[in-house]
A protein has these predicted regions:
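Alpha-helical transmembrane segments and their immediate juxtamembrane cytosolic regions
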Residues: 1-337
């Protein structure tokens, strides 16, 4: 969502941002108004969750890609982080059925990432920062219990400063660890590009194979293959917290989507949507609260209609957004600091 500081915008990157926000809105609407007749472990449920589950990882990789541009001053990084934290509080207040006022979320993760000097005049500092971001996700392998419980309530409740700090760094919805690893991936894609193409192909092949094997094993054992949360620990892939299989699947999915950037850039209006992705993310949140209050146990047809309408309505809105009011967006505010 945070835009790259480059002077010339790349349409493929903007198109990927546009795709990411469409996927994010889609999965949020689908989760808010799910039809009782379609279970989360059905083929359709896995398809929607799988595509929607790539939204946040794609955004984080794009954030890393953007951060790998020109170095920013400490003052600029703090100002951007402050704006993103304010946007997070606004999102929380617009969706009280999901979050507390100070629940850390994806925008607070972007705020933390904005504070990190991914590019720095000192090569020693730059290498140290990037190496640390690459190593920290190993926590999910070495000590997965540190990530906290796989329950929604346990990851959104903030009762004191200790809860806030813990959720920001490790136990929340989108904690810095291990999500910083996906930001590091974005940095690597921008700084090394074609040089890591072969490594990316190998990683993606491994990811596809491992995910396929886990899917087969889940079907064999009669347990969920993937789930947002898994209080009983049965699901192989969990989003909250982001466990190792999920991180492998997410990075694989993002790398595969990345290869479609040039093709997506040709979609009319999609890059324009990407340039308003943060604004759209914030603006769609009140609709989730409205859906929660007004729609209960919808039919499959109604649910599908709501998902399609409330997802794709943002595409023409962004495409025809007047230039005269483009300054009244979160992206414009970020570009000024």
């Amino acid at each position: 969502m945070p835009t790259a500081p480059a002077t010339v915008r790349r349409h493929d990157i903007d198109a990927l941002r546009g795709l990411a926000v469409l996927l994010m809105v889609m999965v949020h609407v689908a989760a808010t108004a799910p039809p009782p007749s379609i279970g989360s472990t059905s083929a359709l449920g896995y398809l929607v969750a799988g595509l929607g589950g790539l939204a946040a990882p794609l955004f984080v990789v794009l954030a890393g890609w953007g951060a790998a541009g020109k170095p920013r001053s400490w003052r600029s990084r703090c100002a951007r982080a402050g704006l993103l934290l304010a946007a997070q509080v606004l999102v929380n207040l617009c969706a009280p059925h999901l979050y507390g006022p100070f629940t850390p979320g994806v925008l607070s993760l972007f705020a933390l990432l904005a504070l990190i000097p991914w590019t720095h005049p000192s090569q020693a500092v730059q290498r140290g920062v990037r190496a640390t971001a690459a190593i920290l996700p190993a926590v999910v392998l070495v000590a997965p219990a540190l990530q906290g419980p796989s329950t929604w309530d346990g990851r959104v409740l903030v009762e004191n400063p200790q809860d806030l700090l813990g959720h920001l760094l490790l136990t929340g919805l989108y904690p810095f660890v291990p999500w910083c690893g996906l930001a590091w991936l974005g940095v690597m894609v921008r700084t090394h590009g074609a040089a890591i193409r072969q490594a990316g192909i190998v990683w993606s092949l491994c990811g596809v194979v491992v995910c396929g094997l886990l899917l087969f094993r889940a079907a064999e054992q009669g347990v969920p293959w993937a789930a947002p949360t898994s209080p009983n620990g049965q699901a192989f892939l969990t989003f909250f917290p982001a466990n190792a299989p999920f991180l492998l699947a997410a990075s694989t999915g993002v790398l595969l989507l990345w290869t479609t950037g040039a093709w997506l850039a040709r979609a009319p209006g999609l890059p324009a949507l990407g340039r308003l992705s943060l604004t759209v993310y914030v603006a769609h949140t009140p609709l989730l609260w409205l859906l929660h209050r007004t729609v209960e146990a919808p039919s499959a047809i109604l649910s599908a209609g709501l998902v399609i309408a409330l997802t794709f309505v943002w595409w023409p809105i962004a495409a025809f957004w007047p230039e005269s009011v483009r300054t009244w967006t979160f992206e414009a505010a970020l570009s000024k600091v």
